[in-house]
From Swiss-Prot:
Glycans are attached at N5. It holds the Pfam family 7tm_4. The chain crosses the membrane at residues 27-49, 58-79, 101-120, 140-164, 206-226, 240-260, 272-292. GO terms for molecular function: G protein-coupled receptor activity; odorant binding; olfactory receptor activity. It comes from Gallus gallus (Chicken). The keyword Cell membrane applies. The lineage of its organism: Eukaryota, Metazoa, Chordata, Craniata, Vertebrata. Disulfide bonds join C97-C179. This is Olfactory receptor-like protein COR6. The gene is COR6. It is a multi-pass membrane protein. Keywords: Cell membrane, Disulfide bond, G-protein coupled receptor, Glycoprotein, Membrane, Olfaction, Receptor, Sensory transduction, Transducer, Transmembrane, Transmembrane helix. Its main location: membrane.
Amino acid sequence: MASGNCTTPTTFILSGLTDNPGLQMPLFMVFLAIYTITLLTNLGLIALISIDLQLQTPMYIFLQNLSFTDAVYSTVITPKMLATFLEETKTISYVGCILQYFSFVLLTVRECLLLAVMAYDRYAAICKPLLYPAIMTKAVCWRLVKGLYSLAFLNFLVHTSGLLKLSFCSSNVVNHFFCDNSPLFQISSSSTALNELLVFIFGSLFVMSSIITILISYVFIILTVVRIRSKERKYKAFSTCTSHLMAVSLFHGTIVFMYFQPANNFSLDKDKIMSLFYTVVIPMLNPLIYSWRNKEVKDALHRAIATAVLFH
């Protein structure tokens, strides 16, 4: 972690979102509200799926895992960002910075792949309804979930081996509100060519495989749905996919825009805004998107409220 007489810094300084004193407290209140909503909605959805037997289906098992990922994702980033609005020095320890970055990488890949698995689940449910119970058993669901963790952890190990070899002699100021790869690479005093190559290769592998899986799944879904004669069945099929497509568009659209743009178009200020969107805003939106028009979730919520009122 050191090169020559270079000593690895014990702390990094995060520049944060803004250095305007007049914006610090308003932004703190806004993002505190967003974080609170994120935790309440995601943890609430996890609890609801856990206690309601009618939601013990593959689709909701995956949704429960998505909510868990979003809750942890937001917790990895937001509390430290909130602290930067209140602190003058805005420091983060070297170990804290590395752990934050690796957690971020792990959760990003996991969510990326989980959205692809959810698309396949919808394909199996709509295109192969008779075989669906045999294709998507609970055992298969949990094996897929464990597989996602394994792939995400593999990506984590690759980035770990690369980042821990970098030295930071010239500067410890990270021009961001959290420890992401681009601002860390910028202040590294050693070559980051291999790190950048690994980010591109593994990022392309996971993101493109996820996008291709989603696109193929939805091509077959659309071809199946247009052949359905019943308007009610057709509406139900489309409605189960709309929320997932919205979540996919938000997450993958932001990731592709950020990490696959030409180098001459890159801007750290623009990168901060896009990072803010998918690390803070999207985890809040996902449970709202999946619950907004979902009759089964609404019915489960009504049952839970009725049960709580009855026993009190």
